[in-house]
Amino acid sequence: MSNRKLQKEIDIIFKKIQEGLQDFDYHYERYESIQNTEDDSDNQREKEKLANDLKKEIKKLQKFREQIKHWLQNDTVHTLGPVGTSYESKLAENKSLIEDSMETYKLVEKQSKLKTFSNQSIMMTFMDSTNGDDDDDDDDSDDDELFSGSDEDEEDEYSDLPEDAVNAIHFFKDSILQLREQTHKLDHEYEKLAAKKLRKNNLATIEAKKEKIQSTIGNNKFHQKKLKKLLRQLTSGVVTEFNLIWLLKDDLNKYLESNGDYEFTRETELYDDIFNQIAAVEEDYSEIHEDNHDHSHSHLEKTSTANGTHHESATTTATAAKNSSVTTRTSPSPILTKANGHIKELSVESGSPTTSRSKLSKIHTNTSQSSTHSNTSSSTHAQAPRQSPELTSPAIVKTLRPATAPSKPVGTLKWSAAAAAAIPDVQEKPELVETESNGSSVHKTVSKDQYEEKINYQSPAPTQQQQQPQTSVESKTLSTTQSLASSITDNINLDKYKEVIKNSNLTKTELGLFSDMNLARVPPGIQDLVISFASKRNNDNFKVLVDSTEFNQFALPLHKPYLPEIVQPSYYSQYTSTSFKHPTPLVKFQSYWNQVRANFGFQKLMDEIKSLTLQNNADNLPIIAELTFVLFYGFYYGVTPAENLIAESYLFELGWKPYKNQSEDGSNNLSTGSISLSDINGSKSKSNRSSNYYFWFKRVKLISRGEDMGQPSNIEFGDYQVFDLSFWEIFVKYGFKFDYNFCQMEPSKTLF
């Protein structure tokens, strides 16, 4: 009877395992399909959701796996089922399927921990593409290639390698063989323990031994895979530095001598350091090779014009003038001709058209002769194309450049479109070179009027039909950009914030800088650049800007006296030596705040908070708190004073009011362990306003007013939501005695 009950339980578990595997495969297929698409914000959120779903499914499957392991240790499993069938094999098969899913989830977990365009992600992609992504292969199929050659073949193969590389190859091959032998012994020992009958007195000991054996086997396989990768690098001859190789050799010796007891597990970063060092050396070599190639090519061009001797070409003067005119239009940079090592530079800003034309024709003739000679002399030397780093190469980290701004906005107004609307077109002045009769070259800078006249003289003016489409496209782009920008700013009154800044007794530089509301919209990098330039004017009367004497890439040159010291942008550099750690979720709020301020979407954020509040649903409370934290982030950590003022006004609109820390006045009504200004600076703050912003209160329920309780009229009792800056949290205080004398009743009219 008990066997039938056990068999029924196993069948139920089998059914649940199949359902769990189907759900896991379904989520993983969706995850893989999104993984191959572009990494925009929507896809990123979907990938995170699918990763969480996969985590839930794998946890269920792991519970079933533990149950299967328990059943496999039971002898009654061998007698279950009809004759010719064995439940033991079915249990082992299901256990194997679950373990395959666990390995798949490890890949998902590894990918989810890496940022899309981080240096680590790019480097790992590069290493996988060059070394082979065989971290998850448990077979030894490639061992035959590593150990198949004879001693004579190996000597011929390694003849070009340095002695250190050959010694390392032999040592690592021996190490792989020893690791394989130890793994086989551990597998045999594990099978013996698994077949041993379990009793209460030896159950814990056997399980501990099995876990230790499994851990050692995993470490052995890890070292084998990494050593195979390293052997490929050594045999290819790309390893030039052996310091880390010898460190690895010492650790491997200790690990092999102790049969895996030495603490050299898969958590080590020594292999990654070695591979990164190899990649860095390859990158440096490629850059040096390219520089040498460019230098040699330029040296050939210079020698062709040395000592002032030129070979006359068979081309006519008209053909030479035509070729040189094309060169002048396509490349505004001058072609310098050397003679006896002397170069003359002459700046010509004015002159008659006739003189300019005669000189221009002379320039064309001499330039064509020198260019024809250089082309003839260098034709025998095939110039190799300059190689650019691949997307998977670590060199791409150093050569990444910002993308150019699009000609017109696509969809909603972007950073680049808003910036491009205010950039005027600048026409550079081309430089031309005239070769004098005595062999020395004359370097001339031609004025804009002369250049336009020369261009018109050489090529006919474009027709009206050619000019009209370009003009219409430019006007359409400008009108579209301006209309989008105006529609964005229509829903917010910026004048009241400008008025507050004007009333703040700022210096002329600060007033002009912070009164520009566009500074509150641009990306953080542009804000940093503009504020850093303004702070270098060294005005002793600055109220907000700071000229820091030390460079700190993580701090802005700002100090806002109207905010607490612990949230100052330059808090780490010169104002205090204490260590205040910002809460981790601020990164998320920073991203949300940057999106909101980019298109002045503050009212949209307000409407969302209000609509969720009106629903009176308890499930919406975490979402409301998250959105409110975004406004608090803008108030405390917004870069410009305009951002702080905008966030403050919307917090007041939601019913939040700053409340002074009463511990400074002898009362301890807020016992939340907050940090006072006296604790930070050692004395009272000079600005009383900054002490008001450690707490914000929002009334949830009014219990009674002060008059009803025999208290002054400025007192009331109720339930309040409280935002605590020191802990960055919102909690509720019930039956709190609220004193309006410690409360700011309306948004700020001035910064100080």
UniProtKB/Swiss-Prot annotation:
Principal subcellular localization: cytoplasm
Identify the Pfam families for this entry.
Not3 (PF04065)
Reading the lineage from the top rank, the first entry is: Eukaryota
| Keyword set, alphabetical order | Activator, Coiled coil, Cytoplasm, Nucleus, Repressor, Transcription, Transcription regulation
| Location(s) in or outside the cell | Cytoplasm; Nucleus
Extent of Low complexity compositional bias: 365-384, 459-472
Composition bias (Polar residues) maps to: 322-334, 349-358
Query: Ranges of Basic and acidic residues compositional bias?
Result: 289-302
The signal peptide stretch is none
An annotated GO cellular component: CCR4-NOT core complex
Q: Which InterPro entries does the annotation name? A: Not2/3/5 (IPR040168), Not_N (IPR007207)
User: What positions belong to coiled-coil segments?
Assistant: 173-230
Bias (Acidic residues) ranges: 131-160
Q: Where is this region: Disordered?
A: 126-160, 289-394, 459-478
**Entry's Gene Ontology BP terms:** filamentous growth; filamentous growth of a population of unicellular organisms; nuclear-transcribed mRNA poly(A) tail shortening; positive regulation of cell adhesion involved in single-species biofilm formation; positive regulation of cell-substrate adhesion; regulation of transcription by RNA polymerase II; single-species biofilm formation on inanimate substrate
UniProt key word Coiled coil? yes
Effect of disrupting the coding gene = Decreases cell adherence to silicone substrate. Decreases slightly filamentation.
Q: Which family does it belong to?
A: Belongs to the CNOT2/3/5 family.
Subunit (UniProt): Component of the NOT protein complex.
**Described purpose of this protein according to its UniProt entry:** Acts as a component of the CCR4-NOT core complex, which in the nucleus seems to be a general transcription factor, and in the cytoplasm the major mRNA deadenylase involved in mRNA turnover. The NOT protein subcomplex negatively regulates the basal and activated transcription of many genes. Preferentially affects TC-type TATA element-dependent transcription. Could directly or indirectly inhibit component(s) of the general transcription machinery.
Q: What is this protein called?
A: General negative regulator of transcription subunit 3
What's the source species for this entry? Candida albicans (strain SC5314 / ATCC MYA-2876) (Yeast)
The protein's gene is named: NOT3
